[in-house]
């Protein structure tokens, strides 16, 4: 029985496979990033308790337990410092892993290029190879060093955030979740369709063609200047620039509505809370308790925007880097 052919991994799965070259450092970075994400919510819990204590004692502030409030204040500061320390440690580990991975990938890629037939270099073009070596592989370093800890944080943060939203007051939590759901639907429509993937592939192809043409143009610049020619004389360079322009402008404009809608919603989730808050206030018998919870949600929902924006940027960068990795793998798959 022959061995089964293993399907090559693509996308995030392939990026994680590459990151596994320095597995211990990557795992350590992921754990520290997850802990940092949890620690980032400690100040919100402490502030909620401070607000609750103050409103419960109103108007007799002399009854406040000042020692307890001071401890909560220190807990807020400790949460901030712990988040910074853990995230800094996570970045140190991820950068060490990234530099080691980058070195290995570049050495392997250069060694492979030295062994492939000469005709392959003529067919592909040095501009495309230079882009893969200098840009695509460099972006993998950026993914491991920065995006990977952010991916872990963007997975852990929504879980902690959801728990807080539902535990403090499930009614206000559901109102906030409606806003989050609308934002996620917009994000999925923007990233999670075949059109977005196809457009990203076309963008990468146009960029590589322009790189190839630019390298050839620079190499032939002495001849061009000697005979008083312009860029129009090098038809391939001119066509590559026009093709890139024709592709990148619609690509940019395609994000006009999605990005505007997503940014507007994630930065104004509190608007979903206000109507629900008015309805609850009209029927509640514990105004102090409700006021403390409502104020907490108004303070807390801006953190939702931070989490969702981080998820959006991680997704966007992941698509670009994945496309670059696929091109690197295509070169590495060439027979020597």
Model-derived regions: residue spans:
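Helix-loop-helix
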Residues: 54-62, 164-178, 261-325
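Cytoplasmic coupling helices
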Residues: 95-111, 152-153, 176-222, 229, ...
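Transmembrane helices of ABC transporter permease
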Residues: 21, 25-36, 149-202, 276-293, ...
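Transmembrane helix-loop-helix hairpins at lipid-water interfaces of multipass membrane proteins
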Residues: 26-86, 166-171, 285-291
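Membrane-integrated ABC transporters
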Residues: 1-40, 61, 67-72, 90, ...
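An intracellular "coupling" helix at the cytosolic face of ABC transporter transmembrane type-1 domains
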Residues: 16-24, 118, 135-144, 148, ...
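Juxtamembrane helix-loop junctions of ABC transporter transmembrane domains
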Residues: 43-47, 79-126, 130, 134, ...
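Alpha-helical segments in transporter systems
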Residues: 24-49, 71-76, 91-94, 141-156, ...
């Amino acid at each position: 029985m022959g061995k089964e052919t293993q399907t090559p991994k693509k996308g995030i799965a392939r990026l994680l496979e590459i990151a596994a070259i320095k597995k211990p450092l990557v795992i350590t970075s992921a754990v520290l990033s997850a802990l940092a994400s949890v620690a980032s919510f400690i100040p919100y819990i402490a502030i909620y308790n401070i607000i609750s204590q103050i409103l419960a004692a109103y108007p007799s502030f002399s009854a406040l337990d000042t020692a307890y409030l001071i401890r909560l204040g220190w807990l807020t500061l400790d949460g901030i410092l712990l988040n910074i320390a853990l995230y800094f440690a996570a970045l140190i580990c991820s950068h060490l892993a990234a530099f080691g991975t980058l070195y290995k990938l570049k050495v392997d890629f250069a060694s492979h290029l030295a062994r492939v037939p000469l005709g392959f270099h003529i067919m592909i073009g040095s501009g495309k190879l230079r882009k893969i070596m200098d840009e695509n592989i460099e972006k993998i370093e950026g993914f491991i060093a920065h995006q990977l800890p952010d991916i872990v944080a963007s997975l852990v943060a929504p879980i902690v955030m959801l728990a807080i939203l539902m535990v403090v007051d499930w009614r206000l939590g559901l109102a906030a979740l409606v806003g989050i759901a609308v934002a996620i639907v917009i994000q999925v429509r923007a990233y999670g369709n075949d059109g977005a993937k196809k457009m990203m592939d076309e963008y990468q192809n146009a960029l590589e063609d322009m790189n190839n043409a630019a390298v050839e143009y620079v190499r032939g610049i002495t001849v061009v200047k000697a005979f008083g020619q312009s860029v129009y004389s090098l038809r391939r360079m001119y066509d590559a620039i026009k093709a890139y322009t024709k592709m990148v402008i619609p690509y940019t404009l395609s994000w006009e509505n999605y990005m505007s809608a997503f940014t507007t919603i994630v930065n104004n989730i509190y608007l979903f809370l206000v109507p629900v808050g008015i309805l609850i206030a009209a029927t509640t018998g514990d105004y102090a308790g409700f006021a403390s919870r409502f104020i907490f949600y108004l303070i807390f929902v801006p953190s939702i925007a931070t989490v969702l924006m981080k998820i959006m940027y991680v997704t966007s960068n992941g698509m670009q880097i994945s496309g670059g990795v696929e091109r690197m793998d295509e070169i590495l798959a060439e027979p020597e």
